[in-house]
């Protein structure tokens, strides 16, 4: 390919390159060692190693062409090639098209300029063609073949992209290729005969970060299952890192965090994920977050342009971003100017006749925006006019909007149980903010605080006259300055709606709230019970929430939201936040503000595991380490900051600050998002730094911070003294220094305003991996603690078994959209019920781990074991059930193992298994396995009732049934007390299958012959005992019974079939477990076989290394 001309010193180059062809102006060279017999000897080997380590282009392109001029030692590299054919093509083109022209130039300088210009033109032409494709299909196809050949992953594994880089093995960099696929990060290197192959699943990564050290200038650090991996020498390290970050977060959300995993068309199907799709999604998410747009919006186009700012009389340079329903602009010249134009507000789009390629967008309210220097502005104007027509048609047609798709009716949590609504449960929606109702402004008696409030209002009115008012107002640095000073009481609700983007949600969903209120009131479920419990705990000191008006409004908003979003339902702290929203916003506005906070501004905060809040706590700790290192040196345990700051994040400081100060924090939050909360948290710690450094323990530090919060005041607050929380305290504690909230917020902006949104987003992504993996580790430790009490395995063996169990669940879900394991995964369930496997997954694990997996009927054994363990017949088993079977196989006594085998051959475990494909022998297809695993054994009615009660009390996700828990616990205790006398008898067909299984288990055993003889003796002994028993119980029929003849000890299995009675007499034949046990104990060979110690540790190690391989083979 053609290269951008760069200087090369030929004197040094000749040591590593050999000349192939040359003429007056060009030289064709070949890299030493390439294309030579024996690889060019030692020199070729060293050059090849150097290329690999330094990631030289020569490693993949060992040919190049240089442009030379006479009497000069400086040459220009202009082309390179992967093979002789490619470079010869370039050489021929130069001779045919360039050489003839060069003779007309007089000076060497003109020749060089001409060649450089020609080559740059060729590169630009190639760039235009390849940009449309983004990736070279030929190269990608070649990389895909290498990926499949090197790692042998299933063909469904989708390669997203690949990069050349170095992997550090100790202190040695190994040059190779990094492949990023949907489920794995893979690296391959082959250097000097040494092969390195690394496969890391995204779901196993707990840390992913860019690092810099003395040796590694820039590298990507990956931590997986306690092992650290470093990759460096990337051509585009930022692009690589962002893509890795997206893939890791996608896997984590999909597999661990189904609760918050949104269906996304870009990520819905793991087989359709592409590099371009991921980049598009990342830009779209960033766009929505920056402009606070509804989550349904997607970024369609981006255009560089200038926007005329009328009040400043200059054009601001920035980017115009267009989505389905919005035109947005953000400056890039440091003016902090941004504009959001909803298409529903647009009246006309015109283009000017001047040469500036300008577009004028006129909106309602007699405002116009002028965008200039737009490329392809003719096409852009046509597209925008089309969008505006579509938007206006939509507005005309739909005046009523149904419940949106993400809240289709009540969830399974909502049982439609009519309630006798109390008096306060009125459906009348408040049309005024509670502050307006309970604290109307007295315009006649204006005190100093009210005068300041009026001055604030005047400042905002001046801003509105300059920048406009409403959704499409200009947002500038002046806007932020006014927000920091505190929004006036009368404008607070309006501006919260504006800055949060809730105004757009409400405008596009008219009538939605009233409909949801109507549908949700009168329902009863766990969420509504929790809401009722917390209603009177929400700002109890405020008069608005001491009356039915405020309480009813709060109930309606919270219940409506729980109905809209059953994934979240209701979470503690939502009541405190909503009560403050209701003070300043109308009821419907408060609902949409809550939607904006829970679903966009604080994602994943208000779910069962408050993952979002935990992630932001980790981000806060990271910022403390960066900005307040002396505090982290003093406070060795960083968990203190986590415990203290949780309420700060969940309630936006409302729970720790007096209400009159907290609302100023909420002002900043709606304008700046989580950045404002993090900055304020740092400012508070910085303000109290000296006190915190003298604290000896956590309790002392908490007391110091609480005392500080008690003395935060808002001296300009116009709220009456009976409402202000700070005023009462300030009288009692006058000896402590008062801190004004406005000064504190200003200080937080001055000191920590340099923290960027992009950095916070990156820290959130990075810490999300760590937080979720920590939660998963907690789940694992709790499961192991419970299970370890019932098994003989060591904790280490149990730990490894759990990892394999969970890994198999994930591997089987990697390439499928609907996996039963993921479908039933619910982090809110008890730890043991969170991860469960189906019969197909159990079969794979049985083949990997069972000491009986060598048996010819291993699929049948796996099926019967699964049916035995699946006591509640939901076709899923948890880790406790799984580990109990493995423990018996490896650590059980002779009696335990025999009892397990006996149970496998009687109902409910046993079922007749016939494979449809006789050629496969006993092997069962996935469909057959699924069919047989779901077969139900008929049981008495009373037993069915008992079985149905064995399901987890929380599986319905409704109210937790304590009685069901006690019943389940009692069942487990009874199960432990089960004796061998409680086991039912085994009939003829079951006994034949039991005998066959024993024969299969003994196959290829060192004592195979003696085991066969022993089982033949036992079988015949049992038959004779049963014959005698029959004669004793049925003397009349004894004459018709054939006399026993001793079987030959050669073929015992044929003797079993010969001596057993005909099927019509089957009901008369059966064996008790005690009979079988007593007979087997008489044969030492059988006892030795079942009591032989088995190496579980080695089996686990082998399973871990071959788990993925076994999946690809099956």
From Swiss-Prot:
Its lineage reads: Eukaryota, Metazoa, Chordata, Craniata, Vertebrata
Q: What is its main location?
A: cytoplasm
Superkingdom per UniProt: Eukaryota
Write down the species: Mus musculus
Q: Which InterPro entries match?
A: EF-hand-dom_pair, EF_hand_dom, GRAM, PH-like_dom_sf, Rab-GAP-TBC_dom, Rab-GAP_TBC_sf, TBC1D8B_PH-GRAM1, TBC1D8B_PH-GRAM2
Localization annotation: Cytoplasm, Cytosol
Q: Where is the GRAM domain?
A: 145-212, 285-353
Annotated site residues (Glutamine finger) in this chain? 572
Q: Which Pfam families match?
A: GRAM (PF02893), RabGAP-TBC (PF00566)
Q: Give me the stretches of Polar residues compositional bias.
A: 399-411
* Domain notes from UniProt: The arginine and glutamine fingers are critical for the GTPase-activating mechanism, they pull out Rab's 'switch 2' glutamine and insert in Rab's active site.
Q: What is this protein called?
A: TBC1 domain family member 8B
Function comment: Involved in vesicular recycling, probably as a RAB11B GTPase-activating protein.
- State the SMART domains in the record: GRAM, TBC
């Amino acid at each position: 390919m053609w290269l951008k001309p760069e200087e090369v010193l030929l004197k040094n180059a000749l040591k590593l390159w050999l000349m192939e062809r040359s003429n007056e102006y060009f030289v064709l060279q070949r890299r030493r060692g390439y294309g030579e017999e024996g690889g060019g000897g030692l020199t070729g080997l060293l050059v090849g190693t150097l290329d690999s380590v330094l990631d030289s282009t020569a490693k993949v392109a060992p040919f190049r062409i240089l442009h030379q001029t006479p009497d000069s030692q400086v040459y220009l590299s202009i082309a390179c090639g992967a093979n002789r054919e490619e470079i010869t093509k370039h050489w021929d083109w130069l001779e045919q098209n360039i050489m003839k022209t060069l003779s007309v130039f007089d000076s060497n300088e003109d020749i060089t300029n001409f060649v450089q210009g020609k080559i740059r033109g060729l590169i630009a032409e190639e760039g235009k063609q390849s940009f449309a494709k983004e990736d070279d299909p030929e190269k990608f196809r070649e990389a895909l073949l290498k990926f499949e050949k090197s790692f042998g992953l299933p063909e469904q594994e989708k390669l997203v992209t690949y990069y050349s880089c170095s992997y550090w093995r100790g202190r040695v960099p190994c040059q190779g290729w990094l492949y990023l696929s949907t489920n794995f990060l893979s690296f391959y290197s082959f250097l000097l005969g040494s092969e390195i192959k690394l496969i890391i699943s995204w779901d196993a990564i707990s840390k992913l970060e860019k690092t810099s050290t003395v040796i590694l200038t820039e590298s990507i650090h990956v931590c997986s299952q306690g092992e650290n991996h470093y990759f460096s020498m990337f051509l585009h390290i930022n692009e690589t890192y962002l893509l890795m970050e997206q893939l890791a977060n996608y896997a984590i959300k999909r597999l661990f965090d189904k609760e918050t995993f949104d269906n996304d068309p870009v990520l819905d199907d793991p087989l359709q994920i592409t590099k371009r799709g991921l980049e598009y999604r990342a830009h779209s998410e960033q766009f929505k977050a920056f402009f606070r747009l509804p989550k349904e919006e997607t970024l369609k186009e981006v255009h560089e342009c200038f926007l005329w700012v009328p009040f400043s009389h200059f054009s601001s340079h920035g980017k115009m971003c267009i989505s389905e329903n919005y035109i947005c602009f953000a400056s890039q010249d440091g003016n902090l100017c941004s504009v959001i134009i909803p298409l529903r507000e647009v009246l006309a789009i015109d283009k000017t006749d001047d040469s500036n390629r300008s577009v004028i967008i006129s909106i309602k309210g007699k405002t116009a925006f002028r965008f200039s220097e737009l490329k392809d502005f003719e096409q852009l104007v046509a597209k925008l006019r089309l969008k505006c027509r579509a938007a206006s048609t939509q507005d005309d047609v739909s005046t009523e909007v149904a419940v949106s798709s993400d809240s289709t009716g009540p969830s399974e949590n909502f049982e439609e149980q009519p309630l006798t609504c109390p008096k306060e449960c009125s459906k009348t929606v408040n049309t005024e903010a509670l502050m307006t109702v309970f604290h109307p402004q007295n315009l006649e008696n204006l005190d100093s605080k009210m005068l300041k409030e009026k001055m604030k209002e005047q400042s905002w009115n001046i801003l509105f006259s300059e920048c406009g008012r409403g959704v499409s107002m200009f947002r500038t640095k002046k806007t932020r300055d006014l927000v920091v000073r505190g929004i006036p009481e009368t404008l607070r609700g309006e501006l919260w709606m504006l800055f949060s983007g809730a105004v757009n949600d409400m405008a596009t969903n008219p009538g939605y709230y009233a409909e949801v209120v109507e549908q949700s009131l009168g329902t009863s479920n766990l969420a509504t019970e929790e809401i009722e419990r917390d209603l009177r705990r929400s700002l109890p000191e405020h008069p608005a929430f001491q009356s039915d008006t405020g309480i009813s409004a709060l109930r309606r908003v919270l219940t409506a939201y729980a109905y809209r979003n059953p994934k979240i339902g209701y979470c503690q702290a939502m009541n405190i936040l909503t009560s403050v929203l209701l003070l300043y916003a109308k009821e419907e506005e408060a609902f949409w503000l809550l939607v904006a906070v829970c679903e966009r501004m604080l994602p994943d905060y208000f779910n069962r595991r408050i993952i979002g809040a935990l992630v932001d706590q980790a981000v806060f700790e990271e910022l403390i380490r960066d900005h307040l290192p002396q505090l982290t040196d003093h406070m060795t345990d960083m968990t203190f900051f986590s415990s203290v700051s949780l309420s700060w994040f969940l309630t936006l400081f409302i729970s720790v600050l007096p209400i009159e100060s907290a609302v100023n924090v909420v002002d900043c939050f709606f304008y700046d998002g989580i950045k404002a909360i993090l900055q304020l948290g740092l400012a508070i710690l910085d303000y109290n730094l000296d006190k915190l450094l003298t604290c000896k323990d956590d309790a002392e530090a908490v007391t110091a911070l609480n005392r500080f919060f008690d003395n935060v005041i808002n001296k300009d607050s116009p709220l009456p003294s009976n409402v202000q929380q700070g005023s009462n305290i300030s009288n009692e504690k006058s000896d402590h220094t008062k801190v004004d909230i406005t000064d504190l917020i200003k200080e937080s902006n001055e000191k920590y305003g340099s923290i960027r949104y992009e950095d916070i987003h990156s820290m959130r992504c990075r810490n999300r991996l760590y937080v979720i993996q920590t939660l998963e580790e907690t789940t694992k430790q709790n499961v192991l603690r419970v299970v370890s009490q019932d098994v003989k395995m060591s904790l280490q063996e149990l730990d490894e078994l759990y990892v394999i169990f969970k890994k198999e669940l994930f591997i089987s879900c990697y390439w499928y959209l609907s996996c039963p394991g993921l479908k039933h995964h619910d982090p809110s369930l008890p730890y043991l019920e969170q991860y469960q496997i189906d019969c197909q997954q159990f079969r794979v694990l049985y083949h990997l781990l069972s000491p009986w997996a060598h048996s010819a009927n291993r699929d049948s054994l796996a099926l019967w074991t699964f049916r035995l363990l699946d006591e509640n017949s939901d076709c899923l088993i948890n880790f406790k059930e799984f580990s109990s079977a493995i423990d018996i196989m490896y650590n059980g006594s002779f009696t335990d193992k025999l009892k397990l085998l006996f149970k496998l051959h009687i109902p409910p475990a046993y079922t007749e298994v016939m494979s449809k494909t006789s050629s496969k022998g006993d092997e069962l297809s996935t469909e057959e396995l699924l069919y047989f695993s779901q077969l139900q054994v008929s049981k008495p009615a009373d037993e069915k009732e008992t079985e149905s009660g064995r399901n987890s009390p929380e599986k319905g996700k409704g109210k937790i049934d304590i009685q069901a828990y006690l019943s389940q616990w009692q069942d487990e205790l009874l199960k432990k007390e089960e004796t061998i006398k409680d086991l039912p008898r085994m009939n003829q067909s079951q006994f034949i299958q039991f005998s066959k299984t024993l024969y299969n288990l003994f196959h290829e055993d060192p004592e195979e012959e003696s085991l066969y003889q022993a089982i033949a003796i036992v079988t015949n002994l049992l038959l004779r005992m049963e014959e005698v028993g029959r004669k004793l119980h049925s003397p009349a029929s004894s004459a018709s019974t054939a006399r026993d003849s001793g079987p030959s000890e050669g073929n015992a299995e044929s003797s079993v079939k010969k001596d057993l009675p005909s099927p019509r007499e089957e009901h008369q034949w059966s064996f008790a477990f005690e009979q079988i046990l007593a007979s087997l104990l008489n044969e030492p060979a059988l006892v030795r076989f079942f009591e032989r110690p088995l190496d579980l540790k080695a089996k686990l190690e082998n399973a871990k290394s071959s788990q993925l391989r076994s999946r690809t083979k099956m």
